[in-house]
Regions:
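Conserved N-terminal substructure of TIR/SEFIR domains
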Residues: 1-65, 90, 163-172, 176
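Cross-kingdom TIR/SEFIR domain
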Residues: 33-34, 52-157, 161
Length: 176
């Protein structure tokens, strides 16, 4: 039986660090669009002059599920970490999250101790320990979720597998 989740505007919110995966995400976005899956992707859906955080928060609220692409540079971005916390606060077990580990090892150790420790330590200086503690907790929570692990394949060759996974997940929660 499907759990119906209303999608106000977007089927899928794509969270990623554009600096190192934008081309791959562009391919994924095109492939999702070909399947009739409506996505939110920051470069397309944020209008010039629009306040960045409120627009992201609204897009997160208006999405049915989330694909979070963790790459080597993901935690460099405080925006990505803020998105992650917002996604977890919004989902609360009702919306689905698909973590994609792109050239990073999955699991709790990945989330902080090796891959992102330097970035998180730098963020503590700028944002304080309390905020970064929330980010660490969010990373740990998502690191322990089942997801896709991609060690090779740059560009779009991994996209079809993600698209199929998204279609399966949406079929469970979205009314036809």
């Amino acid at each position: 039986m499907a759990i119906l989740v209303p999608c106000e505007r977007f089927d899928v919110f794509l969270s990623f660090r554009g600096k190192d995966v934008r081309e791959s995400i562009n391919n994924l976005n095109k492939d999702l669009d070909k399947e009739g899956i409506n996505t939110f992707m920051d470069s397309e859906n944020l209008m010039m002059g629009q306040d960045f955080p409120p627009a992201l928060k609204d897009a997160i609220k208006q999405s049915c599920m989330y694909v979070i692409v963790f790459s080597k540079k993901y935690a460099e971005s405080s925006w990505c970490l803020k998105e992650l916390v917002q996604i977890l606060e919004r989902s609360r077990g009702k919306q689905l999250i698909l973590p994609v580990f792109f050239h990073v090892p999955p699991g709790e150790e990945w989330s902080q101790k090796r891959t992102y420790e330097k970035e998180l330590a730098e963020h503590e200086i700028e944002f304080g320990k309390r905020k970064v503690k929330k980010w660490r907790e969010a990373l740990t929570q998502v690191a322990n979720m089942p997801g896709r692990h991609l060690q090779d394949g740059i560009d779009g060759d991994w996209s079809p597998g993600i698209v199929e996974h998204v279609k399966e997940m949406l079929a469970k929660i979205k009314p036809k």
